[in-house]
Amino acid sequence: MTGDNTLIHSHGINRRDFMKLCAALAATMGLSSKAAAEMAESVTNPQRPPVIWIGAQECTGCTESLLRATHPTVENLVLETISLEYHEVLSAAFGHQVEENKHNALEKYKGQYVLVVDGSIPLKDNGIYCMVAGEPIVDHIRKAAEGAAAIIAIGSCSAWGGVAAAGVNPTGAVSLQEVLPGKTVINIPGCPPNPHNFLATVAHIITYGKPPKLDDKNRPTFAYGRLIHEHCERRPHFDAGRFAKEFGDEGHREGWCLYHLGCKGPETYGNCSTLQFCDVGGVWPVAIGHPCYGCNEEGIGFHKGIHQLANVENQTPRSQKPDVNAKEGGNVSAGAIGLLGGVVGLVAGVSVMAVRELGRQQKKDNADSRGE
């Protein structure tokens, strides 16, 4: 890596940890180790890509999710690796000063900056429900989009309207794509989306000058290419007909499938179960006992009832799955379980460090169960 390492070292990140981060991002997108090196070269380039982040009708959840990411200290890495020219929440200035800075950035970096929009855009009553500096937010967004090298809709609200567009939709909220017809908008839905999906997308744009492969809804396929149901840890219980019927019942306590509690995993695409959140094992809704509510999918999240049954798109049981009757520990060695975790982890696109932690935790759990 011949790029400038000053940024990395200034935040207490050594080269090894930084390369692990780049390798994890590449693995998340299903890319090779060569791609990891190319990403490392690009993101340490002193010519940082300018980013303009505009918030519309949003709750700031996407920003909070990004700032609380760790892999390691992604919040610092992102804010220093890119040149964040405008972000209302994170700006030290306010009022006329910050608006002037935004307009200067739009002119200075025309054709070079990445435009990120967070939140739905209200169109009813000429857009008066979200105003900035005396102008409807839709006008700010359209102006910024004219000179953008890439456009990203982050979060479900920006990707397809989200909660603001549900029900009677009093503000006439729409998605970013609807106000920018004819432009390619990269959608990264989620409420909030996993910050590493956003980071990996930006890293791909920085490295290759183009978006990653997108699906028919303009979502990166590395993150939204498979049904959550297909790689959920509770899927074996679904195949075996074991379902929790009420919160707190035996099935719920035993970790059985949450389909009958309204889990939308069978009709929602995402990598929630494999990437999880903030490098903490088991941190995603289903793992902590709550059904997925389909926030990644238009017409499902915020539209279907939380406990309304999902449409099962693929009812064929997986050909290879663990036995739901197997007891933890048993005759399977901790080393074998750690090795299995490593194989599954590589396939799922998680980091090597996460896999090692899985193996260490499994050994500890087995030792505890034996009373050692």
Curated annotation (Swiss-Prot):
GO biological process, one term: anaerobic respiration
Subcellular location(s) of the protein: Cell membrane; Periplasm
PTM description: Exported by the Tat system. The position of the signal peptide cleavage has been experimentally proven. Can also be exported by the Sec system.
Keyword Nucleotidyltransferase attached: no
Annotated signal peptide: 1-37
One GO cellular component term: plasma membrane
NCBIfam families linked to this entry: hydA, PRK10468.1, TAT_signal_seq
Assembly and binders: Heterodimer of a large and a small subunit.
Name assigned to this protein: Hydrogenase-2 small chain
Taxonomic source organism: Escherichia coli (strain K12)
